[in-house]
Amino acid sequence: MEDRSHKVLLALVMLFLFAVIVLQYVCPGTECQLLRLRALSPAAAADPYRAEDETPARFVPRFNFSAGDLLRRVDFNIKGDDLIVFLHIQKTGGTTFGRHLVRNIQLEQPCECRAGQKKCTCHRPGKRETWLFSRFSTGWSCGLHADWTELTNCVPSVVDSKKEVRLRPSRNFYYITILRDPVSRYLSEWRHVQRGATWKASLHVCDGRSPTTEELPSCYTGDDWSGCSLQEFMDCPYNLANNRQVRMLSDLSLVGCYNLSVMPEEQRNKVLLDSAKENLKRMAFFGLTEFQRKTQYLFEKTFNMNFISPFTQYNSTRASSVEIDEQTQQRIEALNFLDMELYDYAKDLFLQRYQYMRQKEHQEARRKRQEQRKILRAKQAHLREQGENSSSTDYLGNVERWR
């Protein structure tokens, strides 16, 4: 019995070796489809953008956007007068993205960043003026973490004098920003405040003035709010962390700035949310912290500027280390219900833009391949025609000699 099993095993080994020899003979090299199965496997062919941030394989859009809303390609003239303006919302990953802008872009004249200095010099090629308005290039020129209302009213006057405005009417301001999941962002801000951050230097200018203490009371009485518990953080009704992303992206002039008595709360919330959605949609670009590689891809396609090193998805943050129960999670979502709705809208628009741009990219690649095949076929036809003409000439010459 044992001898028989040895014979069977030997036969199987011989059969396997024979199959390998036949395969190599019938299909040598690496061009055989059978040998390419591994290369075509899902693991090897996985989309790097999907693998990086674990996007679901099938994204189903919820909102209807026009082709104009989805296609974002701006003619950014870095050698001219165009300016990229970065709206930096607290605890959205804006610091990381801001560093990418000054240290990680392939430029004819790279930004000059010196050790120990917070700001980099980002001049246009051959000029002594900046192409980037951000924390790491111009500093907080319009106030600490200036919002949409502040930036749109401040940037033009800071960048240009009245005389320059008349001389340069064609300057384009391209606003960009980064958003983050509201619960993660809120927890991150709480941890930051708990460590002593205040952002007291923020101006909150709207309609030409900062809010009064009655319009914007403080959540604490001392120099800062260090050591505050999450419960205390959530209990303050004036906490600017609540719905921060909607507030910083909307036109506050539409609701009377920080004066809550101008209109009913429900109406105010709707106006703010609608304004934030519209401003976000009309921005030249926005990215999402949860999708680093896609953020990089869309920025590169939008501005035709390439980063040197790929973005990295960091899933371990101070916010992710905070363990909260379901009740606390629901409380945070309720406090940030406008941000939750804005983020759903932004995520849908972001992923639709990504899909649209990838489709355009694939269509363009297919068109180029078709053009190349067309040119190749034309060359082959031309060569065949030349060969036929040559054969015909040789034949006629022989006929003449035979006579």
UniProtKB/Swiss-Prot annotation:
Catalytic activity: alpha-D-glucosaminyl-[heparan sulfate](n) + 3'-phosphoadenylyl sulfate = 6-sulfo-alpha-D-glucosaminyl-[heparan sulfate](n) + adenosine 3',5'-bisphosphate + H(+)
Enzyme Commission no: 2.8.2.-
Residues in the Lumenal compartment per record: 29-403
Cytoplasmic side, ranges: 1-7
Glycosylation sites (chain numbering): N64, N259, N315, N389
GO MF annotation list: heparan sulfate 6-sulfotransferase activity
Region named Disordered: 381-403
Assigned keywords, A-Z: Glycoprotein, Membrane, Signal-anchor, Transferase, Transmembrane, Transmembrane helix
GO cellular component: membrane
Binding site for substrate: K118, K119, R135, W140, H145, H192, W199
Location within or outside the cell: Membrane
BP-aspect Gene Ontology terms: limb development
Principal localisation: membrane
Binding site for 3'-phosphoadenylyl sulfate: 88-96, 180, 188, 312-314, 318-319
Family affiliation: Belongs to the sulfotransferase 6 family.
Function of the molecule: 6-O-sulfation enzyme which catalyzes the transfer of sulfate from 3'-phosphoadenosine 5'-phosphosulfate (PAPS) to position 6 of the N-sulfoglucosamine residue (GlcNS) of heparan sulfate. May also play a role in limb development.
Protein's UniProt name: Heparan-sulfate 6-O-sulfotransferase 2
Gene behind this protein: HS6ST2
